[in-house]
Amino acid sequence: MTVAAQLNAICDEQPFVTRFMVRNLLTGEEIGRGENVETPSGSTRKTSIMMAVLKAATEGRIDLDQPVTYEKRLAEEVASGMFRYMTPGIVISLRDAVTGMMVLSDNVCTKMVLERVTLEEVDGYCKSLGMANTHHRFLIPPLALAADHPLKTVTTTSAADQVLLLQTILDAQSSKLAQEKLGCSAEACAWALQTLKNQVLRYGIRSRLPFEAVVASKSGRGKRGRMDAGIVYKNAAPFFIITTYTDDVAQTMADGTPGYTMALETIGKLSQVCWSGFQS
């Protein structure tokens, strides 16, 4: 059974929609399923926010060392991260706010960041990179958002758009052309990749890989599903890129299992097949 057949079989097992794109970085082989379909981004959107901030810093328009104060208002409508449980008045750098947004998906930190670059700027940045199906629409999705919300009520992306972004970040580790495309210095591109590697959350892509496997990724969750997008390494070298988006996931499956559990398990299985199949 081919890798592509195995990946599609995993998706076919579930009643919800799974869209993905994988790229074997050893051979260039690509496998996709609905990879160009616009889908809720969840927090995978934050990788492009990070890169837009780094571009602004490279251009001297913002200072990553500027102090940012945690104010109580920033915790309103926030359902992720740890800052919302902490005492207002804490001061961190903008760089640390970007780090918190990425490695813990802290939406207090996301608000801090998006008060220094605009959604319009981030959205335009994505379009300039060729991310045609990525649309940044809101700072933070409202907590009361319905599970069957329309696409236009959230930020959206596609599996292919996220592969494009991750590949460009990876290329920028050595390619001046990729650095220029991102609008970021070599140092900023190196920092971005390391920040993706510092991801704390280990479900999704990482869940069925060897514990020591290095993954540079950003996961996400939304009312309609779970998602994860990352670069998987083997023996310290880039191995494959995988971006996966589940959609129309029920709150509870027919057997009583929470829908998000099966969504994350599906992402883990897809990653595991790539890890095993691309090695043979």
Regions found by a protein language model. Name each.
Residues 1-40:
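Beta-lactamase-like hydrolase cores
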Residues 2-8, 30, 169-202, 218-280:
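Structured C-terminal helix/loop/strand segments within mature extracytoplasmic catalytic/sensor domains
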Residues 14-17, 112-171:
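Mid-domain, small-residue-enriched loop/turn segments at the edges of structured enzyme/sensor domains
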Residues 40-68, 242:
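Active-site SXXK
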Residues 51-59, 164-171, 272-276:
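Short glycine/serine- and small hydrophobic-enriched flexible loop segments
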Residues 65-71, 190-194:
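Beta-strand segments within the central parallel beta-sheet cores of soluble alpha/beta enzyme folds
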Residues 75-113, 119, 151:
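Conserved catalytic neighborhood of penicillin-recognizing serine enzymes
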